Amino acid sequence: MDLKKLLICTLFISINLFSNEHVKEEILKILVYNTHGLPEIFIDDDPKMRFPIIGRKTGEYDISLIQEDYAHHEEFSSNFIKESKFFRGPMGGTLLCPFCTGSGLTSIFNLPQEWKIEVDNEAYQTCSGWLRGANDCFAYKGFQIIKITTSKNKNFFVVNTHMDAGRRDSDRASRKIQLEHIVSKVNKKRINDALIIAGDLNLNSKDAEDMKLLEKFKNDLGLTDIFKDIKIDEKWSILDYILIRQGKEINLSVVSAGEDESFVTEESPLSDHPALFLELLIKE
């Protein structure tokens, strides 16, 4: 009888060990940050001081999803760690608008060397405001759809975006169309894998109409708002979001999330937005 129990126990342990060999876990630390990167003439701080610090701090993260990397990219990228891979979004200066800037999107990766990264840049087809409504039409805002393939040949997707600002009805109408653009693109690509969508959506958490847009967007793509019940310092307006969806092959579990309060100098924060972070346990 004892021998029979021993054999059953040994078999059970062996099965579990065999199963665990096929489950790989990885913790990813993700930064989402609008860097306030307008040209110096439009801001009242010192971007030449701020951006090298922000660039260095991206080395603390596996994935950094950056918005407003407009006028200070040279200072910003000068302090990336040597192994970082980075991809900028759609650039400006076209024949139709030679003085327009690019999307300001930059995604930075410090992932395992054997992982693959593919980036698809897309510009929004609408904007609101040339001389009013936050002047969004002077930037080719858009989004990046990033396909990440792990060493086990399993995929998950990340979207980095910066949407139309401003509080007018026309600004909100543009945001609605931009959200629909993301939904359409995700569906067109038939993305059924795990999905992370993050960035400056310019959807104010205290604006009921903006929140209706966010809820519809979440429902359309089956997303969960990671920061819904996480308190951020009251000095910030909540415009930035991290939304996730589980996949069939990869499971995303939240380890921790919040504001990285180290993004400051002795005088002030490094931007006019909070630095949001998310630690994810990825099981494949």
Where are these regions (language model features)?
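N-terminal, active-site-proximal structural segment of metallo-dependent hydrolase catalytic domains
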Residues: 2-11, 17-80, 93-102, 156, ...
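Extracellular/periplasmic catalytic domains that process cell-envelope and extracellular macromolecules
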Residues: 23-25, 57-58, 81, 98-101, ...
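Catalytic metal-binding/acid-base residues of hydrolase active sites
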Residues: 36, 70, 162-164, 201-204, ...
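Short, solvent-exposed loop/turn segments at secondary-structure boundaries
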Residues: 42-46, 133-134, 169-174
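Sec-exported extracytoplasmic/periplasmic mature domains
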Residues: 59, 77-85, 113, 184-191, ...
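Structured beta-strand-rich core segments of catalytic domains in phosphoester-bond hydrolases
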Residues: 63-157, 161-163, 254-260
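His/acidic metal-ligating clusters that form di-metal
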Residues: 142-159, 171-212
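Metal-dependent phosphoester-hydrolase catalytic domains
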Residues: 186-196, 203-284
